[in-house]
Amino acid sequence: MNKLRILLLARHATVTLAHSRTADVAAHTREADIVVCATGRARAYGPEYFSPGQTVLDVGINFDAAGNLCGDVDFGAVEPVLGPEGAITPVPRGLGGVTTSVTMAHVVQAAEAGQR
């Protein structure tokens, strides 16, 4: 997450990082254009955290009480709030493929660098 923060700041974005002791996280997330959720808590973020037109990137990989794979965001409850102008990444079949691809690219780069 730190690398993403640095990249966004380099583009003059205002970056807010929330944690477990941040007061009223929902007030911060409702005002953001882009929200990245990466807390590791199944469906912890419901519709009260979001506003129409936002882009929500759900990085969380969790299992709910029934054993189903899910993200940090309650996708079914949040997607209607975002509306047609908004977007949300699903879990599964969302950012996981990107993460795997980037990780493999780094492994290949490291292997190639080691052969030089």
Task: For the regions a language model picked out, list residue spans one by one.
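Rossmann-fold NAD(P)-binding glycine/threonine-rich loop
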Residues: 57-115
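Glycine-rich phosphate/diphosphate-binding loop of Rossmann-like nucleotide-binding domains
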Residues: 1-55, 68-70, 75, 79
